[in-house]
């Protein structure tokens, strides 16, 4: 790969991350410059895989796209590593994996978790939703931490709490989008407990039962966030940088308290940058 191609690939990934995951992109501005390219590559990959459902109308094309990514990472099948050089996100991701010795199996588990996205199966229960968060959002935190040189068992536990907090928050933020395509990430046991009817969610009826379920989900997200922050209070600053997106999660959870289910809050890019800068400047870490 030429230097010119490498710069073009990195710029493509930065634009993709900035467009689809500004929360992580903003955090990347405050990490050591030499690690930023890998952060962006990971974020761009996550955006590609997370948005597969948005680009397909049937499960099979989504499965094929996800399998291509598996093949790229393992060097097997149609998505060989040679072919990957033609894809800027794949090329940048493979560079990051090689440079920072990132575990391929973590990326593969993330891809496997996103197979759920291309179908309309209900999320069975809270345990299944938390497992999904573990393999997606928590995995992203752990990978970013490893790029920064922080990969201890303590960091892994923080990543678990942070990932669940972020994942549950994103489920609430994405409720209108999911409901519009008759897809539910709300856990089935919580829906049953609160008397939430799936068809009413699909019709975007924000009734009391749904609000009660979301309140409980929000409390769990807040609890997970607080546990992550408590553990970060004594963590090295290098490790804390991996969790900068939590500053935004805290703000969103607060706004969700006064929002309607199908009119979730939004933070401006300036607001995201401000919250991230404050967290990056704080000692110890706070969100």
Question: Language-model segments: what does each one mean?
Answer:
Residues 143-147:
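Alpha-helical transmembrane segments of multipass membrane proteins
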Residues 115-128, 206:
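Acidic/His metal-coordination segments adjacent to aromatic residues that form catalytic metal sites
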Residues 1-96, 100-111, 133-142, 154-168, ...:
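Catalytic cores of Mg2+-dependent Asp-rich isoprenoid enzymes
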